A protein has these predicted regions:
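Mature catalytic core of soluble alpha/beta enzymes
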Residues: 2-10, 14-350
Length: 350
């Protein structure tokens, strides 16, 4: 962990611009913006910033509190490692097909919410896609190590894995705080939801503590708590998928969340074709409707889930779902066309 004083977010998919983050002024005096970065959560860099003129002691306490929450959920959501005295998603996956396992109430609440989102998104946000996602993940990793041997999954591999993605295999006993995966070949993967959910929990803790004028950036998931002292927001850039050194659109945001999913970040190439990491549950292949999709809504967990679910939906279906949930969305199509909801248009910065 290190203390930082300016925004250095050059690898994020959604990036607060330096021009939008100059030190605000309070009626009394100029205040120093404060920030800390953390490198241990969700395999990415996380940032906590304050523009509220907090004392150093108050900022240290609040940033430590937010960091602690991110760390707690990082451990709960980890599908690769178990931790002493704690049953997490890795524990559940390794015991698939076995007996029910007692878990922390926080993990119960999360999994219940995940199942609700499955219904809300008509199955496009499915945390039981682990059997399929792991195949693509392993092949993408192998291609990075040896590009000459890169391949895509066979139809047989995907069809077999696709038989083990039934959300009903995730059995939750809320009263007794236990979870069971009934299918021994099924597994949980919360890559489309976990980071946003953890970010939202950290933001709610900050809000309950009276924080205002804070910004969380957890690997590109932006959650803003309040506004700058003068009541203004932050200018946030959405990368141009065709040239990621530039911005396709700039947004002015305050007291909300912003999450982008894109086909240009995690991918590998086979025979000149790019295969990215956002897998459509209907085809078991990377979704090809859009190059980039940005969601703005206050709840970071919902923003995270929708950025994946809508990426896997035709435009008309996605627009209808976004409207029903009060989410603002910006779609960038493979040919460069940009569409957005009426509310998103109001957020576009001049």
């Amino acid at each position: 962990m290190k203390r930082i004083g300016i925004w250095l977010l050059l690898t994020a998919m959604v990036i607060p611009l330096l021009a939008g983050c100059s030190a605000p002024e309070t009626p009394a005096a100029q205040t120093e913006n404060k920030g800390k970065s953390y490198f241990t959560y969700f395999d990415t860099v996380s940032y906590v910033y304050s523009y509220a003129g907090d004392s150093a002691e108050q900022f240290d306490r609040r940033s430590a509190g937010a960091s602690g929450i991110l760390g707690e959920y990082h451990r709960l959501f980890d599908i690769y490692h178990e931790y002493s005295g704690e049953n997490n998603l890795c524990t559940l996956n390794r015991n698939a097909g076995g007996e029910s396992i007692e878990v922390d109430r926080k993990l119960i609440d999360f999994l219940v919410y995940a199942k609700e989102l499955y219904e809300t998104t008509d199955g496009k946000m499915n945390v039981m896609m682990g059997s399929v996602l792991s195949i693509w993940h392993d092949l993408r990793t192998a291609a990075g190590d040896d590009p000459a041997s890169a391949r895509i999954p066979t139809d047989e591999e995907l069809q077999t894995a696709g038989e083990h993605t039934d959300i009903s295999s995730l059995e939750i006993d809320e009263e007794n705080c236990t979870v069971r995966i009934s299918d021994p070949d099924a597994s949980i993967d919360v890559g489309a939801l976990g980071k946003g959910y953890a970010t939202e929990m950290a933001a709610r803790w900050l809000e309950a503590d009276g924080a205002f004028g804070y910004v969380l950036n957890v690997g590109g998931n932006i959650r803003i708590v309040g506004t700058k002292p003068d009541g203004s927001g932050w200018v946030t850039g959405v990368k141009d998928p065709a040239n990621t050194e530039k911005f396709a659109v700039k947004l002015m945001l305050a007291d909300t969340s912003c999450v982008t999913s894109g086909s240009y970040e995690r991918y590998y190439t086979v025979d000149g074709v790019r295969y990215h990491h956002i897998i459509d549950e209907a085809t078991l292949f990377p979704a090809d409707y859009y190059s980039s999709l940005t969601v703005v809504i206050k709840d970071s967990a919902l923003a995270d889930a929708l950025s994946t679910a809508l990426f896997c939906m035709p435009y008309e279906d996605g627009a209808a779902l976004a409207e029903s949930l009060g989410a603002e969305v910006l779609w960038i199509f493979p040919d460069g066309e940009i569409r957005y909801t009426p509310g998103m248009e109001k957020l576009i910065a001049n």
